[in-house]
Every structure is written in C-alpha cells, then in structure tokens.
Swiss-Prot record:
PROSITE patterns: ZINC_PROTEASE. Its cofactor is Zn(2+). This is Leucine aminopeptidase 2. Keywords: Cytoplasm, Hydrolase, Metal-binding, Metalloprotease, Nucleus, Protease, Zinc. It comes from Sclerotinia sclerotiorum (strain ATCC 18683 / 1980 / Ss-1) (White mold).
Length: 608
C-alpha cells in the first residue's frame, strides 16, 4: 500500500521523474490547455501493466505512450474528494528502471479547483485579466493528470504560452516565439522555465497577468502589478537578503538559485505559498510599515523544510509546517533578538488555542499525526501542524540543549534532501544522530512519542519570555475597567505585533467591551483606517464581540477587499453571530472575488 491515502495513483509501481508542461493560457475561455509529458520510471519488473494517475475535472483528449497514440486508457468514476483516476494500459508492463513517456493532451474545465481567474474588474488597475494557481494540497490533479502526492518528486520544464507575462515555479529562461493573435486578439509569447531540483506536484505553480518586476536583493526580485511595484519593493528590500543569509547559517546554503516574491491580487487565499523560485504572497503583507515581512521569513524557510525535504503525505504535514515555523522563528531571533522568538511563539500559541477550540480538544485534526483516509486534506488545514509542530521541535531543542540540537538541523536537511519522509523516519533519524551522544540520548529517553504524535488537544505549554508582551497584557488589563479612558500615547512606540497581542488579550475577555468602549479604542489607537489587516481584522473581532454596530459595515467592506482565509473565515464566523443577514449578503456579493478553496470553506462555515 502506498503511504499517502490522498492519491489514487499507483506510485509504488511507477514514479514520475520528469514533467514537461507545454500549456497555453486562454483568458477568454478561462482555460489552460496543451500537452503534459510525464516521464515515469517502472519500479517493478513488468509486474504493473497500467499507470494510474490522479485527475479531477480535467478534460483528457488524447494520450500517447512513448510517442505512439493509444486508445487503451479510461477515466474512471469520480471518487470524492480525490477525483477520477486515469488508467493507461501498458501491455506487458516494463522492466524495472525503464522510463515510459506519457504525452497527455488536456484542457482544464470550469470546475478546476487549482486555478483562479480574475476579470480585469477584479484586479487593481482594472486593465487586464489575471490568473494564478494554488495546488496545495491536492489540486494539481485539476490542472493535468499527475501522481498528485508529496511522496513523488519530479524535475520540470515549463513552456507556457500567454498574451500576458508568466511566472512559474522554475528558473526563467526568457520569452520567445511571438505569435500574432487572430480577430484582433492580443499576440502571445512562449515563456520557458526549468526546475532541476525534483519537487512534489503541489509545488507546480503558474501565474499570468499584468506583472512588473523589480530587484529586492542580489538574488531576489519582487513581481506584482505595476502600480503596486514600488510599494512592494520598499516593503521587502530591507530584509529579504538578510533573511536568506541568516537561515543559510542555520541550515546550509540556499539551493534554488533565486528567491523571488510574487505579490498576488487580494483574493489569494493564503498568507503565502512557498512555490520554488517564486514565493506567492498575499498583498496583506504590503502594509506600508514592514511589520508583516515575517511571512517572507516563513516562506523562505520552506525552501529547506517542505521544498527540499517534504512530508510524504498530508498526514505528516507538521514535518513541513512545524519545521518551517521553527526556522522562521530562528531567523527572527537572529535578526531581532531571542525575545522576539518567544514573542512570535506567544502569538502562535493563541492561534493554536483557537484551532483546538474550533475543532474541539478531542478532534482527530488536533493531533500532530492525523488520519486522512477518505478525507480532504484542505478540511484539516489549521494552525495545528504549524504551532503544535513548532512546539514539538522547540521541546526537543530545550531537551538536548540548543548548541547540541543545532548540529542536528543541517544533518536532518542533508539526510532527507530531495526526498520525502514521514514522522517515524524523522524519529529514527533523530535518535540515530544522537546515539553516540550519551547525554542527548539519555534526555531523549523521556520523550513520550505516542503522546506527541497521537494525543489530541494542546501540548504542554512552555515558559515563554514575556518581556515583549507584558505591556500588551498590562494595557489589556486596564480595558477591563469600564472607566478606562484611552489615549494614543498608550501604544506609542509599539510594533504592530504588540498591538496584535493586546487585541488578542481583549478578545479573551469573558465579558466583551461595550460598544462605546469599542469605538473609543478604534479612535484612540487608529484601528479603523489602518492599512495593516492584521490590526483592522482583530479590532473588528473585538468590535463584533462588543456588538458595536459601527464596525459591521467596515467588516463587510474588508471582506470584499481581502481574500486571505485567515482573515476571511474568522470575520465571517464572528459576523454571523451578530448579523447573519449581513454575513450572507456580503458572501453573496463577494463569492466570485474569493478563490475556489476559500469560497468552499466559507460556504461550509455559513451552513454550520
């Protein structure tokens, strides 16, 4: 049995080694079409006479095996939530190690879950259409048939024809072969990219639109809409190279040549997506104050944890995200000081508590290692793998001591480089590495692996250094009194994240603020019209809990401007409680603005 339950492919019999995506982007029909070539290696000796690939809502038109057209293929019945397996017969099988090339001619359909198409009206300058992909966790199969599992890694060639600039998760080779458009349509160029480091299918990425580019460092570019370019450049140019150099000292040198950032339109559903060469990022990080660039530290860290060393299935997602949060906080500590690591961890602990509360403390999805048989990995997405995963690694670091632990980090990322692993292999690698270190081995004997892996709910809470949050807590305490009169000087000199911690504390009050208190807070601390969504969204949360009607419409307005699920889902849930009608109307009005992944999750939330 393959160890990934979320794929229908028979990847234990055949392995994708190289993928050529020769595709055209059709903005008018909102389709991607063309030919994808999969070079698959036979893992058995003639035992398997069919290749089974994942597909979901893809229109498969024709298939060739080693250059010869075949009719011996069938798209089988849909198996929710995984799609329709595509079976291609290989009569007589193939000797072990033989490479078989499948050329599959496809078109995406309007049910494709990986692509979002924006009309010109949905973009900022309203001049051109835009498209982008989001393949994690199991959405690449809705663009083209593939072995859609993180347990398989392939090198890639991208040849993408589009009337607008294209970016992909490979190194750019440039644009060539202009073709004139017909009937007054725009002409197209062929944009080529290559990826020589094998990567899992969920890191396949495409974007095309009115995209301009500027340098933000010696090996980094930022790409975004022309109007936003200078703001994005300013936001990122101070820290990007510094972050790269910092993490290179913790792990080992950056392997992907360039580290670039594409700032997407506002409907992008995540904070960032660690697509190799081009991190896809939410525009909410461009807040004009450089306060949210930690998202870049996180996505950059994925270049090691997740992209070079990958979880073998989504049941072990903590190996991607826990490690990435751990490395992100190590970058922050090195750049800003150790207290900032704890400060970030305190914010993360609150997010973990929120997730556990939302699922329920006995829920399967609050475990570190989850059972996803028959389940959609998107449904399990929460801060649990991020924060519980971080806490496990932080616990291990404290157990063996930081200088000792720091020797393990490059060893782990070297051992599993360009491979995928599960939690049991992580455990074996760790114990094996420290076997010759008597003190560390002794310390590791106390680890209750079963509880960490399989016990639902919160892990043990460590003692944090609270020096940076104490004043946030102290100010929140003052707000417990109905007589407190706020002043802008209360938060003078604070970072945005300190205001976030203060607002989180206020959200924990057993008795919410009164509407007049909520309004006074918004006014004194300039929280209504801030460009920083981390602040406005949390302030609206406080106001909604206070039943302060003055924030209802601004909340609905924000929900029409931001598509990042972290903000969207939380605000809809809170708006539902106080004004279901407004929540439903706001969703109806904006549902075409949201990404399909976000739209589906909010629809589920509204039904609950």
């Amino acid at each position: 049995m393959p160890r990934d339950p979320n794929t229908l492919s028979n990847y234990n019999n055949w392995r994708t080694k190289h993928t050529i995506a020769d595709l055209a982007i059709d903005f008018k029909k909102q389709r991607v079409h063309g030919t994808v070539t999969l070079q698959l290696e036979s893992i058995t000796d003639k035992e398997s006479e069919e290749i089974i690939l994942d597909t979901s809502f893809v229109d498969v038109q024709k298939i060739a095996v080693d250059g010869s057209k075949t009719e011996e293929w069938v798209l089988k019945e849909r198996n929710e939530p995984y799609g329709s397996p595509l079976s291609v017969k290989i009569p007589g099988g193939a000797a072990k190690g033989t490479i078989i090339a499948l050329d599959i001619t496809i078109s995406t359909t309007d049910k494709c879950t990986a692509l979002q198409w924006l009309t010109p009206a949905q973009t900022s300058n309203k001049k051109f259409p835009y498209m982008f992909s989001q393949c994690q966790a199991i959405h690449n199969r809705s663009i083209f048939p593939c072995q859609d599992t993180p347990d398989v890694k392939s090198t890639y060639d991208f040849r993408i024809r589009s009337p607008l600039p294209v970016l992909a998760s490979g190194l750019p080779r440039g644009a060539a072969s202009f073709v004139h458009g017909e009937n007054g349509e725009s002409g197209t160029l062929l944009y080529s990219f290559y990826q020589e480091i094998p990567m899992p299918s969920y890191l396949f990425a495409l974007s095309s639109g009115d995209i301009a580019t500027a340098s933000i460092g010696s090996r980094s570019l930022v790409s975004t809409g022309p109007e936003e370019l200078l703001g994005a450049k300013w936001e990122l140019e101070r820290d990007t190279e510094k972050f790269i150099e910092t993490i290179e000292k913790i792990v080992y040198p950056y392997e992907w040549t360039q580290y670039n950032v594409l700032v997407l339109p506002p409907s992008f559903p995540y904070g960032g997506m660690e697509n190799p060469v081009f991190t896809f990022a939410t525009p909410t990080i461009i807040s004009g104050d450089r306060e949210n660039v930690d998202v870049i530290a996180h996505e950059l860290a994925h270049s090691w944890s997740g992209n070079l060393v990958s979880n073998a299935s989504w049941e072990h997602f903590w190996l991607n995200e826990g490690w990435t949060v751990y490395l992100e906080r190590r970058i922050i500590a090195a750049v800003h000081g150790e207290a900032y690591r704890d400060f970030s961890s305190i914010i993360g602990w609150k997010a973990l508590e929120d997730s556990v509360k939302l699922f329920g403390e006995d829920h399967e999805f609050t475990k570190l290692v989850v059972d996803l048989k028959g389940k959609d990995p998107d449904d399990a997405f929460s801060s649990v793998p991020y924060e519980k995963g971080f806490h496990f690694l932080y616990y291990l670091e404290r157990l063996v001591g930081k200088p000792t632990w720091d020797k393990f980090i490059p060893h782990y990322f070297t051992t599993w480089k360009k491979k995928s692993l599960d939690s049991y292999e992580f455990k074996a690698t760790l114990l094996d590495f420290f076997a010759s270190d008597e003190a560390a081995s002794k310390a590791l004997e106390s680890v209750d692996w079963d509880s960490w892996f399989y016990k639902p709910g919160l892990p043990p809470k460590p003692e944090f250094d609270t020096s940076l949050v104490d004043k946030c807590y102290a100010l929140a305490k003052k707000w417990e009194s109905k007589d407190f009169v706020p002043s802008p000087s209360d938060i003078e000199g604070w970072s945005a994240n300190q205001v976030v911690v203060f607002l989180q504390q206020v959200q924990l009050f057993t008795t919410p603020l009164t509407p007049s208190q909520s309004q006074a807070m918004g006014k004194a601390y300039s929280l209504v019209d801030t460009q920083n969504v981390e602040l406005s969204s949390r302030y609206f949360g406080v106001g909604l809990a206070a039943k302060d009607e003055s924030v209802y419409l601004p909340t609905a307005e924000l929900l029409g401007k931001v598509g990042r699920m972290k903000f969207v889902r939380t605000l809809y849930r809170k708006l539902l409680v106080v004004d279901r009608k407004l929540a439903e109307e706001t969703f109806e009005k904006n549902k075409d603005f949201y990404h399909p992944i976000c739209r589906e999750q909010v629809e589920k939330d509204l039904k609950e």
